[in-house]
Amino acid sequence: MPKHGKKYLDAAKKVDSNKLYSVAEAMKLVKETSYANFDATIDVAYNLSVDPKQADQQIRGSIVLPNGTGKTQTVVVFAEGPQAEQAKAAGADFVGSDDLVEKIQGGWLDFDVVVATPMMMAKVGRLGRVLGPKGLMPNPKTGTVTMDIEKAVKNVKAGQVEYRVDRQAAIHTPIGKVSFTEDQLVENFDALRDVILRARPASAKGQYIKSVAVSATFGPGIKLDPLNLD
């Protein structure tokens, strides 16, 4: 068992580890138990009864949270011509082609999201070993490979988050900051819950959502009732 510091232990005392909290209770408690000296991120973790090894049970997508994430995302766009101009007009931080490929190959990674047109994916593909492990590779399922560059950039800037089931059949996604109101966190949680419920594979067996927990960057996990997420 890892050793926890005094701040964590003090925060953990406020959480009943045997209780499954309602969404409203959890959002109140996650704010109260954050002990960071900065505006910490609040994450939600879902554990699902899916088999990620099965192609038809891989869950992945993106959603623009109603209240954003509280974080300003730095967006890189691979595009040329009219799409490059769209990207700049929509607020992309860096727009280019071969020049960006070379820059990233040289070790530059000061960005959060990569968007590309389909025509540019042959070039972006050369960065697979760099972008892939960091979860930065553009993908049509998350709306980051598209001809509608303007919409993609605006969505990211408005607070779009990606959700993806990992090898342990879990989804980890940020839903806001400690500075958010409880209502804002509940609204963001509800929006993410709805898309995850809609994404249930037809072949998934048993209770789809096995467990749910929320936590701040520095704070204990708070378990929710997976059968009562309203």
From Swiss-Prot:
Any Gene Ontology CC annotation: large ribosomal subunit
SUPFAM superfamilies (alphabetical): Ribosomal protein L1
InterPro entries linked to this entry: Ribosom_uL1_bac-type, Ribosomal_uL1, Ribosomal_uL1-like, Ribosomal_uL1/biogenesis, Ribosomal_uL1_3-a/b-sand, Ribosomal_uL1_CS
Domain of life assignment: Bacteria
PROSITE patterns documented for this protein: RIBOSOMAL_L1
Keywords on record: Repressor, Ribonucleoprotein, Ribosomal protein, RNA-binding, rRNA-binding, Translation regulation, tRNA-binding
MF GO annotations: rRNA binding; structural constituent of ribosome; tRNA binding
Keyword Ribonucleoprotein: yes
Task performed by this protein: Binds directly to 23S rRNA. The L1 stalk is quite mobile in the ribosome, and is involved in E site tRNA release. Protein L1 is also a translational repressor protein, it controls the translation of the L11 operon by binding to its mRNA.
Subunit structure: Part of the 50S ribosomal subunit.
Annotated protein name in UniProt: Large ribosomal subunit protein uL1
